[in-house]
A protein has these predicted regions:
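A basic- and aromatic-enriched beta-loop-alpha substructure that forms the phosphate/nucleotide-
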Residues: 84
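Conserved phosphate-binding catalytic cores of ATP/NTP-utilizing and phosphoryl-transfer enzymes
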Residues: 89-97
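Short, high-confidence coil segments that cap the C-terminus of an alpha-helix
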Residues: 103-107
Length: 156
């Protein structure tokens, strides 16, 4: 039996935990480090779609665009999720569907938070000097989705 070439396959997993306080390490740097831990540089360069779970600790217009540049996949399409507890799984599901349909060949899913660093810096009156994307950078698909945090039954 031959495997369909468009069968989604998980190639690697990477996780980076930043234990020390560093005002220099921003969320997109953590995502790039995790990506490098997950896959060989040649695999990362082949990524044609970067999908990022919504970040709460720092605002980027398109974090996937920054991440794609850091891993050498500058031409990758990007997607940014809305806020919600199941968004990582939703991004994975959609990546598999897109690979099966031939809309993507290699998808990188990423996410990162630097909340502890932000709060420690804030307590000292310091604002991180992290990447600020110009407002002219378009928000990628998914980035403006409004995900309700409660259903009609809960709103009563």
């Amino acid at each position: 039996m031959t495997l369909d070439p468009q069968t989604p396959v998980l190639v690697g997993v990477g996780q980076v935990n930043q234990r020390e306080e560093s005002s220099d390490t921003e969320p997109v740097d953590l995502m790039a480090a995790a990506a490098r831990e997950a896959a060989d540089p040649r695999v990362l360069q082949a990524v044609d779609s970067v999908r990022v779970v919504n970040l709460l600790s720092w605002r980027y217009r398109d974090p996937g665009l920054l991440l794609a540049g850091l891993i050498g996949a500058a031409d990758a399409r990007t997607r940014y999720s809305g806020i919600g507890g199941n968004t990582p799984q939703s991004l994975l599901n959609q990546a598999c569907v897109d690979i099966q349909a031939g809309r993507a060949d290699a998808v990188l899913l990423a996410g990162a938070e630097t909340w502890r660093t932000r709060m420690r810096l804030r307590a000292r009156g310091i604002r991180p000097d992290w990447t600020k994307q110009d407002e002219s950078v378009p928000v990628p698909p998914g980035g403006e989705e409004k995900v309700p945090m409660s259903g009609p039954g809960e709103d009563r």
